[in-house]
Amino acid sequence: LQNEFQTLIVSLTNEQRGVFDDVMAAIEDNKGGVFFVYGYGGTGKTFLWKTLSTAIRSKGQIVLTVASSGIASLLLTGGRTAHSRFGIPLNLTENSICSINRDSDASKLLKQTSLIIWDEAPMVHKHAFEALDRTLRDVLSFGNVRNSHIPFGGKVIVFGGDFRQILPVVPNGSRQEIVNASLSSSYIWTNCKVLKLTKNMRLTVGKDPSEIQQTRLFANWLLDIGEGNAGGSNDGDAVIRIPEDLLITQSSDPIGSLIEFVYPSLLDNLNDPKYFEERSILAPKNEVVQEIN
């Protein structure tokens, strides 16, 4: 692990190294700390998580890596969903706690943990973070009352994500209700040190200039949508025109054409895990997913 860490650490950008140093300093200080790493897709959050995890594990210490969804957790070494790892209730209220007892194995693991990384945090209801906060304050205060007065019981925790992407699902909720359900509307947010990643690393790996330019244009378009600039001024609703080169316009079987575009030569690659790691089809609703499947 030490050799792997040395390879990773020299590959960090200045931005990533700044975040890395801040988090590691908090761990060494042993007084806790809550961070939020704000970066859109492609800024290297996953690489940063890997570097932090390897740095800590190479010292024989424990880091828990979780994500808000199962798919996101697959990108993390030893990753699990936050709900599974911490026993977060599915039906949350403002007074919820996690199903972790003081004398349980999960409690013992948390006491020995040096760092918690929670990826894709913005998509989870704020009550989930507050439930974990209450639970850690309770579990970790046994033998040290001071921890009951420190966010997350004095553990260093790093949240990551992009508030321009998916926010918590509030059934039939208004814009205001959805925003109010977000992490940034929780009492926890006042304790978060926000660190930003702004450099798109995907623009540095392509060798073909035209490919880099195409990626840059697409990334800028996504950012415009996230910032609310793509559809003109609006109060939450907007009509956004999708570029022609992203549309399937002339096909008698659009779904078949989509699958062929995303999974070319599928039958020849059935035994190649990397082939499937590099591509996926996303849809906003289950009914669309079922239609494609």
Give names to the regions the model predicted.
Residues 1-293:
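RecA-like helicase/translocase P-loop NTPase motor core
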